[in-house]
């Protein structure tokens, strides 16, 4: 008789524990479901930057739908210093391009830091050359003064290009051409260059340049 009572009590205890465990699991599952709705899920990199790859030889971009893109850079031109006739020619060229080119395209404008690396290298080299001439023995004071003037001018120009790179921005324009395949893309690029004429002087961008441009588009507050 005692054995039956003990067995019944043990079953009650186990059943109670099972019920409590199920309630606890149910609460945890409910809480997990609530928090899951607030949790940020990691987005695919293709969703953030919808490009599959960049062809290093051609600079062609392949997007997530396997369509192709090419970025063409517009020749930098100081529109503010143009006379009215030249400015009208530019405007008419863009109007004509939009009328005759029927495929999709996009115009981008981005602000860059002005690039003066080549000018810096040149004026540094000239300054060192003139400084070397000054350190050599010269026959006349007049000749020594001449080399000093040239050295001072080189340093002045070097400081000027350094200031330009640090303080001035360059507004650059790009045209994006699209194609479903390489044959169609090549045709569209040729047409775009022809319609752009000498005014736009459209040039293909290298893969490294395209990579920097895409980075800038995805990180607008970052410096190039």
Swiss-Prot record:
- Keyword annotations of the record: Plasmid
Identification of the protein by name: Uncharacterized protein pXO2-10/BXB0009/GBAA_pXO2_0009
């Amino acid at each position: 008789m005692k054995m039956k009572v003990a067995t019944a009590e043990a079953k009650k205890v186990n059943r109670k524990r099972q019920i409590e465990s199920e309630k606890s699991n149910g609460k945890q599952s409910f809480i997990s479901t609530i928090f899951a709705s607030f949790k940020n899920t990691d987005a695919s990199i293709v969703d953030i930057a919808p490009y599959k790859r960049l062809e290093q030889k051609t600079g062609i971009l392949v997007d997530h739908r396997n369509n192709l893109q090419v970025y063409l850079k517009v020749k930098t031109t100081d529109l503010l210093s143009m006379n009215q006739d030249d400015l009208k020619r530019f405007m008419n060229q863009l109007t004509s391009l939009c009328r005759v080119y029927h495929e999709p395209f996009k115009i981008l404008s981005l602000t860059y830091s002005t690039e003066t690396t080549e000018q810096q290298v040149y004026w540094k080299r000239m300054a060192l050359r003139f400084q070397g001439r000054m350190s050599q023995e010269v026959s006349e004071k007049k000749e020594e003064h001449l080399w000093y003037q040239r050295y001072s001018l080189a340093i002045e120009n070097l400081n000027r290009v350094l200031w330009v790179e640090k303080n001035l921005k360059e507004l650059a324009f790009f045209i994006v051409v699209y194609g479903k395949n390489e044959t169609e893309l090549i045709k569209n690029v040729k047409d775009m260059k022809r319609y752009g004429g000498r005014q736009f002087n459209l040039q293909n961008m290298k893969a490294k340049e395209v990579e920097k441009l895409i980075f800038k588009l995805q990180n607008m507050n970052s410096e190039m």
